[in-house]
Amino acid sequence: MRFFERFKTTKLKLEAELIEREIHRSKRFGYTFSLLVLEVTNSIPRGLSKLLPGRTLSFHTLQKNLRPYDKIVNSLVRRYYIILPQTNKIASDKIKHRIYEMAEYYKWGDINIGIATYLDDGNDAKSLIKAATELLEDYSYRDFNDETTIQLARV
């Protein structure tokens, strides 16, 4: 158990460091960025996979549908952070819905996504991670398959 706690702490430090780099860049150039926390449920066998697409959530499919400069950070076994530079709350919400559409199309199963935006939800890495984690939304197909769903434009 002690090993897992140390591993978890080390991983969170690495993620916080990447988020802090993006915060410094945002301060320097005067723009915001968003942090998406993507959590996959137990219905996906091994989470996000670079090697085993198909039964798992494919890293390449997710990366292909994001912008080239968006960063996907592998956190723990079933949680991933997506850093979206130069993205405000509205654009990150559209990206979240695009990920939900991909989950439905590729039959990934249920996923949860939380969003935090720099300056709106926090000024440092810890507060952004905490805000996004608290806002994890449960996703199920019946909630998303509604005629009033927003038409998603590529951001």
Which residue stretches match the model-derived regions?
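Active-site-proximal structural segments of metal-dependent nucleotidyl cyclase/transferase enzymes
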Residues: 18-49
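Short helix/loop segment flanking the catalytic signature motif in cyclic-nucleotide metabolism enzymes
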Residues: 45-54, 82-98
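Conserved helix-loop-beta segment at the catalytic/binding core of cyclic-nucleotide signaling proteins
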Residues: 24-28, 57-89, 101, 105-108
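Short coupling/linker segments associated with nucleotidyl cyclase/phosphodiesterase signaling modules
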Residues: 2-23
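Heptad-repeat coiled-coil signal-transmission/dimerization helices
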Residues: 15-19, 52-62, 96, 129
